[in-house]
UniProtKB/Swiss-Prot annotation:
Keywords: 4Fe-4S, Cytoplasm, Iron, Iron-sulfur, Metal-binding, S-adenosyl-L-methionine, Transferase, tRNA processing
Record: residues binding [4Fe-4S] cluster 1: C19, C55, C89
Subunit and interaction comment: Monomer.
Designated name of the protein: tRNA-2-methylthio-N(6)-dimethylallyladenosine synthase
Catalytic activity: N(6)-dimethylallyladenosine(37) in tRNA + (sulfur carrier)-SH + AH2 + 2 S-adenosyl-L-methionine = 2-methylsulfanyl-N(6)-dimethylallyladenosine(37) in tRNA + (sulfur carrier)-H + 5'-deoxyadenosine + L-methionine + A + S-adenosyl-L-homocysteine + 2 H(+)
Gene Ontology CC entries for this record: cytoplasm
Domain TRAM: 387-455
GO MF assignments: 4 iron, 4 sulfur cluster binding; metal ion binding; methylthiotransferase activity
Functional description taken from the UniProt entry: Catalyzes the methylthiolation of N6-(dimethylallyl)adenosine (i(6)A), leading to the formation of 2-methylthio-N6-(dimethylallyl)adenosine (ms(2)i(6)A) at position 37 in tRNAs that read codons beginning with uridine.
Enzymatic class: transferase
Amino acid sequence: MPAANAQSRGSYWITTFGCQMNKADSERMAGILESMGYRAANAELEADLVLYNTCTIRDNAEQKVYSYLGRQAQRKRLDPNLTLIVAGCVAQQEGESLLRRVPELDLVMGPQHANRLEVLLNRVDSGQQVVATEDHHILEDITTARRDSSICGWVNVIYGCNERCTYCVVPSVRGKEQSRLPEAIRLEMEGLAAQGYKEITLLGQNIDAYGRDLPGITPEGRRQHTLTDLLHQVHDVSGIKRIRFATSHPRYFTERLIDACADLPKLCEHFHIPFQSGDNDVLRAMARGYTVERYRRIIDRIRERMPDASLSADVIVAFPGETDLQYQRTLDLIEEIGFDQVNTAAYSPRPNTPAATWDNQLPEEVKVIRLQTINALVERCARERNARYAGRTEEVLAEGINPKDPSQLMGRTRTNRLTFFQAAGPDGHQHNPGDLVNVRIDAVRSFSLSGTPLPCVEQR
């Protein structure tokens, strides 16, 4: 809600492209706008301020942004009072050139500047056309986010990325790693718990690299601040029932972290660990810093400690120079491990990345065929993995109403399976968003489950 002394400044609309980090940034920027007196618009074309929080990890996401911008630029030529903003990774990558391409823009701001939105808008109000893409230390706890959910919340714990994967633009647009202090993270979680939140997902580009930039060494000679230590420090926040984290890098996913996830009861048994390729030579070309054998050991240890854990990953097919045999090894690894879900993408050359300059790019038709083939395998593996839930009773956190059937609630199991069930149980009990519900699984599909609610585990 706007601050008590904030004057109404009209309405705003935010469209978010890309990852969970962007979604969390958008929530913070929405909070800033509402503290300034803006209110959420009912539709984009009704908004007095339009903000696109952008993604540049693949070319198709970037082109979609320009399509949206074209429509709003045309609108602004008819209504000069419209405030038009591009934030996020496209803004960081393109900077001043965005103003040349879309001169109707008022503000171009990289992801490191999300917390500075009010300061930057004040400059816009004074008549400036503003570009903010310089390196900037991310300020701690200066905004209150406007959350899109009142049940599940995101908490950023580390910003940026120090890796140098040859295909990836993230380090150049999100900057170097900046870890938040554990005390600040815990304080934010306590605030969310006080508002009634039940589940928190801790976020970072490489979340298991958390703390590498923070000072301190333990008497045993290891870093004082790690993701494992952070999980222990926030686990007892009263009111929070579930904790997740994403996204992990295999290089930093330690046995100590796995043991903490197995031992701490609030930690959900779901792990998103990208592997990108099932071939070691391709991994070396990508500069990923681990081998397929290392990845297998991580998965083996997870399943040793948490046999029913669900696993998801990211993979890139048709990387420059990828042979048929190397591609087949990726297919074989997916089948061998049996992922619950894999996010797939054909390689997309990105500006200012080494791989984009290589002369062994694969033809588009090869990319299409390899992507179609791997997607069919991923769906089959997901369906086979989901089959194990049939007839079981799973704890589901009801997150909201099924938009396709208002009589149903939808939520996720601890293993992150999307689950639908009737809000009214067979005994007539009415379940509500925020309830933890025991659901008997009656039907399974590739990427979701359906079931019957049993007596409520816990009501909100």
